[in-house]
């Protein structure tokens, strides 16, 4: 932490102020993504034709397996893992409904298949699609003492699929909790004795199960794994690689446009104390939705994301309490006339927020969805109020109880805010009823916020305390309960398990809102697991984050 004295003439009675500067690392990307070289139109058109031809071939293969559920499940699994399931949403929906009705509702189990892999795959794919199939289907793999049978010990493929399936568990499914421990322990003991590619697949799953992985990032990893299996579907693999490259071109174009916009604002110079993280922010947004139909939605959320990241740092790492009070009041008024009442350094940020929202408002008006702006503004106001509450705690050196801390910290996690903004560009599916549901703070939102807040606090609290940050949940919990830091981490890990079960429960049918809206919440939660699993990868951009960004936005797939 470094204290700097900065004159602020526009704040009454303040001549020199001592500020705790966080010294965030600068952006590592520079202008790398500003320039975008468009692909030759003829080559682009040829690739698009190939994609359409391959899509038709895959559709025919799906249709041909209608009476072969295991083959159909394997094709569906591959399309999802390769990141191309969005092309076949209707076909996959119909196939899974057919499988559910004919193998579960009519028979109450997955008849005709007694191996662990097949049953676990069936269970996982149906659960992923919202069907609450019973975990009793795994009873056949347990002995009379309710332990999983010793005969499963060497079935690495089946154990891996069981391990993946257990991450779809909900509350009260102790069998799946036991199955997770059993599969995880056994896989850890045999992984070094397995051959490639299964060994690599097991290692990856033990680090990050499918349920917590970002679909686009998981696809990049799965390309080489899938290709290494002799049984891979060549049409699927080629389609996935071509589609990946076409989408990557679109994403690079979007990022190039955003990079020019961001540079024109010159926030890096105007707010040198704040994190300059446009590229990392765009990676975050790609985690929420990568599909081409959400291009407008991405452009909206990345602009707002960069604004709120700067505001967060103004509250956390620069502003005085008096200045922050002025900014908070200006946000509540939401009026360009409030500019005159702000310190000079705050004005560009406040003005840019209003400009971005005006731009979004014009787009919403064109779509006949102006009602969405009420929610977008209200959620911003509430977020800033939360930042102000934390700033007061920090100023007073107050350490709240964990129960007092969490309601504010869930707001400042920003995840209700980001979910709201993520809905703005999603078209008619984001109805007024959907926004009202979101603002009722349903369990799935609280769970998503909890994952964000708990993982953020676990990974960033030491750096934050070194620079004079508000007490994190770790400090609050340690002080209130008189426990060690490791004991606090253990409790947070238990709460993370609970939160993921809440999310799984809320993603089961019947859906309270359309599934695409729930997927934004699930994907936002997944982003946190990717960026904050071992460190705060957003603030301190190290190898893991660099590699993830490069894999999605720099390195094409070799077809």
From Swiss-Prot:
Entry annotated with the keyword Manganese: yes
Leading EC class: lyase
Entry binding sites for Mg(2+) 3: 464
Gene3D superfamilies: Farnesyl Diphosphate Synthase, Terpene synthase, N-terminal domain
Cofactor list: Mg(2+); Mn(2+)
Cofactor comment: Binds 3 Mg(2+) or Mn(2+) ions per subunit.
GO-annotated biological processes: diterpenoid biosynthetic process; geranyl diphosphate metabolic process
Keywords in alphabetical order: Lyase, Magnesium, Manganese, Metal-binding
Motif mapping: DDXXD motif: 312-316
SUPFAM superfamilies, alphabetized: Terpenoid cyclases/Protein prenyltransferases, Terpenoid synthases
Function: Sesquiterpene synthase producing the monocyclic sesquiterpene alcohol germacrene D-4-ol and helminthogermacrene and minor amounts of bicyclic compounds such as alpha-bulnesene, gamma-muurolene, alpha- and beta-selinenes, when incubated with farnesyl diphosphate.
Protein name: Sesquiterpene synthase
Organism the protein comes from: Santalum album
Lineage: Eukaryota, Viridiplantae, Streptophyta, Embryophyta, Tracheophyta
């Amino acid at each position: 932490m470094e204290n700097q004295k900065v004159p602020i003439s526009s704040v009454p009675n303040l001549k020199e102020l001592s500020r705790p500067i966080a010294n965030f690392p600068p952006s590592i990307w520079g202008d790398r993504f500003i320039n975008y070289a468009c692909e030759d139109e003829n080559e682009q058109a040829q690739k698009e034709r190939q994609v359409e031809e391959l899509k038709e071939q895959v559709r025919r293969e799906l249709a041909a397996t209608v009476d072969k559920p295991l083959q159909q499940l394997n094709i569906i699994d591959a399309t999802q893992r390769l990141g191309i399931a969005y092309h076949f949403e209707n076909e996959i929906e119909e196939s899974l409904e057919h499988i559910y009705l004919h193998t579960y509702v009519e028979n109450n189990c997955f008849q005709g298949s007694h191996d662990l892999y097949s049953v676990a795959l069936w269970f996982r794919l149906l659960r992923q699609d919202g069907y609450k199939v019973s975990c009793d289907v795994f009873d056949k793999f347990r002995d009379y003492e309710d332990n999983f049978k010793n005969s499963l010990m060497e079935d690495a493929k089946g154990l891996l699929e069981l391990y993946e399936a257990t991450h779809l568990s909900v509350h009260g499914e102790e069998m799946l909790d036991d199955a997770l421990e059993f599969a995880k322990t056994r896989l850890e003991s045999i992984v070094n004795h397995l051959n490639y590619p299964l060994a690599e697949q097991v290692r990856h799953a033990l680090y990050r199960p499918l349920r917590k992985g970002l679909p686009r990032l998981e696809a990049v990893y799965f390309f080489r794994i899938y290709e290494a299996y002799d049984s891979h579907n060549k049409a699927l693999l080629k389609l996935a690689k071509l589609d990946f490259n076409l989408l990557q071109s679109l994403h690079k174009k979007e990022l190039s446009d955003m990079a020019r916009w961001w540079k024109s604002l010159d926030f890096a110079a105007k707010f040198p104390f704040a994190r300059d993280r446009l590229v990392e922010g765009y990676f975050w947004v790609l985690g929420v939705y990568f599909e081409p139909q959400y291009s407008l939605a991405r452009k909206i959320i990345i602009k707002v994301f960069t604004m709120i990241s700067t505001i967060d740092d103004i509250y956390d790492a620069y502003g005085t309490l008096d200045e922050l009070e002025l900014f908070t009041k200006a946000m509540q008024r939401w009026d360009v006339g409030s500019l005159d009442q702000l310190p000079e350094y705050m004005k560009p940020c406040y003005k840019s927020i209003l400009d971005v929202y005006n731009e979004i408002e014009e787009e919403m008006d064109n779509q006949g969805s102006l009602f969405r702006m009420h929610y977008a503004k209200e959620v911003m106001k509430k977020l800033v109020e939360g930042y102000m509450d934390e700033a007061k705690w920090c100023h007073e050196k107050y350490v709240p109880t964990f129960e007092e801390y969490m309601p504010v910290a869930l707001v400042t996690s920003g995840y209700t805010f980001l979910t709201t903004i993520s809905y703005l560009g999603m078209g008619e599916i984001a109805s007024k009823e959907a926004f009202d549901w979101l603002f009722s703070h349903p369990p799935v939102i609280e769970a998503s916020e909890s994952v964000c807040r708990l993982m953020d606090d676990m990974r960033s609290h030491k750096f934050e305390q070194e620079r004079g940050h508000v007490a994190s949940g770790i400090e609050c919990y340690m002080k209130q309960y008189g426990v060690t830091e490791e004991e606090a981490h253990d409790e947070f890990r238990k709460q993370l398990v609970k939160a993921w079960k809440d999310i799984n429960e809320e993603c089961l049918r019947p859906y309270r809102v359309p599934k695409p809206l729930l997927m934004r919440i699930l994907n936002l939660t997944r982003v946190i697991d990717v960026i904050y699993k071992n460190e705060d990868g957003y603030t301190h951009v190290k190898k893991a984050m660099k590699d993830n960004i490069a894999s999605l936005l720099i390195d094409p797939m070799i077809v």
